[in-house]
């Protein structure tokens, strides 16, 4: 029984290849021009990359180099003071 089921499965899996379209048929609705698709994707990626760099360099994110040296973590006031915790 298992041999019959396996052979039926192989037969059913192989049937669509008998009626498959020619991959070089340019009039087929499932024919894709992969080179043009790849070039279009690279152009789109380049434009998005350039836009990202422009946004980063647009001046909205300014770094000030003449700032005072940053404080060490222990120099600030304590965040938890005695009596600030509450019992639930």
Swiss-Prot record:
User: Quaternary form?
Assistant: Regulatory subunit of the sodium/potassium-transporting ATPase which is composed of a catalytic alpha subunit, a non-catalytic beta subunit and an additional regulatory subunit. Interacts with catalytic alpha subunit ATP1A1. Also interacts with non-catalytic beta subunit ATP1B1. Interacts with the alpha1-beta1, alpha2-beta1 and alpha3-beta1 NKA isozymes.
- What parts of the sequence cross the membrane? 39-59
For this chain, the Swiss-Prot or TrEMBL PTM comment says:
Glutathionylated.
**Which regions of this chain are Extracellular-facing, per the record's topological domains?**
21-38
Pfam families membership: ATP1G1_PLM_MAT8 (PF02038)
Query: Which domain of life does this protein belong to?
Result: Eukaryota
Q: What topology does it adopt in the membrane?
A: Single-pass type I membrane protein
Residue numbers on the Cytoplasmic membrane side:
60-88
What subcellular compartments does it reside in? Answer: Cell membrane
Q: Which family does it belong to?
A: Belongs to the FXYD family.
Q: Identify the GO cellular component terms for this protein.
A: endoplasmic reticulum membrane; plasma membrane
One biological-process term from Gene Ontology?
monoatomic ion transport
Annotated gene = Fxyd3
Question: What role does this protein play?
Answer: Associates with and regulates the activity of the sodium/potassium-transporting ATPase (NKA) which transports Na(+) out of the cell and K(+) into the cell. Reduces glutathionylation of the NKA beta-1 subunit ATP1B1, thus reversing glutathionylation-mediated inhibition of ATP1B1. Induces a hyperpolarization-activated chloride current when expressed in Xenopus oocytes.
Stretch list, region Disordered: 66-88
- Point out the signal peptide segment: 1-20
Q: Which Gene3D superfamilies match?
A: Single helix bin
Q: Which UniProt keywords apply?
A: Cell membrane, Glutathionylation, Ion transport, Membrane, Potassium, Potassium transport, Signal, Sodium, Sodium transport, Sodium/potassium transport, Transmembrane, Transmembrane helix, Transport
Q: What is this protein called?
A: FXYD domain-containing ion transport regulator 3
| Gene Ontology terms for molecular function | ATPase binding; sodium channel regulator activity
- Give the matching InterPro entries: FXYD_motif (IPR047297), Ion-transport_regulator_FXYD (IPR000272)
């Amino acid at each position: 029984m298992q041999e019959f089921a396996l052979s039926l499965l192989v037969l059913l899996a192989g049937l669509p290849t008998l009626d498959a379209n020619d991959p070089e048929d340019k009039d087929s609705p499932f024919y894709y021009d992969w080179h043009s698709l790849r070039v279009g994707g690279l152009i789109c990626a380049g434009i998005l990359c350039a836009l990202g760099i422009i946004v980063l360099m647009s001046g909205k994110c300014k770094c000030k180099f003449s700032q005072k040296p940053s404080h060490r973590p222990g120099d600030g006031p304590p965040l938890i003071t005695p009596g600030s915790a509450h019992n639930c």
